[in-house]
Amino acid sequence: MNPGKGPDSTRGMGEIKRQQAAGEFAIGRLVSARRSAAGAGRARGVAITWRMARNELDIRPLSGAVGAEIFGVDLAQELDAETVAAIRKVWLDHLVIFFRDQDLPPAKLLGLARHFGQPIEYPFVKGIDGFPEITPVIKLERERVNFGGLWHSDTTYLEQPPMGTMLVAREVPPYGGDTLFANMYLAYERLSAGLRDLLDGLVAVNSSAKADVTQTREDRIRDHGRNDARPEYEALHPVVRTHPETGRMALYINGGHTIRFKDMTEEESAPLLNFLFAHQTRPEFTCRFRWDVGSLAFWDNRCAQHNPINDYHGFRRVMHRVTLAGDRPR
């Protein structure tokens, strides 16, 4: 198999799930769980090691709420089914996973993504040359606005929002530019029983017009002097969704795209929405990731939100993003 192209999405998901269900392979074995000192500049934490036929994964949680770093695997190499299944399990358990020091040119980035889902094109920003599914996420030295600079889950204004997103760092500032992530399982579970009962029956309206989270250098160049409006998208989704793989319930609104509740005005919706927006990003639900060139993050849009911090004015930051097709939230 060509490692640049990777396996097709059926092999990446359906075949692995079939093998797991049939008991044709197990996801390695737990070797140790220990407290260890990470490398320079990295947090200390409990390291969990999974040993498999071809790889030994060292898993280090980034916080008590969300996120884990995975060491011991070269993502540019062809991944066997056991390793893919192990990575997917850590991803489902921790909602966002991080890898460092990865050499992933565009073809190999797409090949990696296809192990976990079907890459899709982003509706507002043109992909890089030759790879329409890879979105450039760029902030130049002179620019003041960053891409997606607020808490959100990607493109919830679509009828079928992406289930996951991969982001790899190509150029990073000398400091700043970290990304925050938040656990929407915890955001739902920490609400009172009465409020959970109320939210379980509500539907939210999500719109691409609420916040200009797609304003990038390319957008500004394209829109300068033009009168034609960009298309707007709107979708209805349950305020609380059930994760199709874990079965857990997660709060599924976000400050970037959710504008109101169905059958309510924005004014009527605002008090409860504003409370929930503040609640779902409480510090105890979050982690913070510092990027280096070659770092890759892979997050689950169905149960996590993210917020790229815009604190590196005067420096250049270049990332490549791949989103994976999802289903309609239920």
Question: What label would you give each PLM region?
Answer:
Residues K5-T10, G14, R142:
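Residue-level detector of transmembrane insertion/anchoring sites
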Residues E15-R18, A37, T165, H313:
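Residues in and immediately flanking transmembrane alpha helices
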Residues A33-A43:
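Compositionally biased, low-complexity flexible segments
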Residues T49-L296, N301-R330:
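Non-heme Fe(II) oxygenase catalytic core, chiefly the N-lobe of the double-stranded beta-helix
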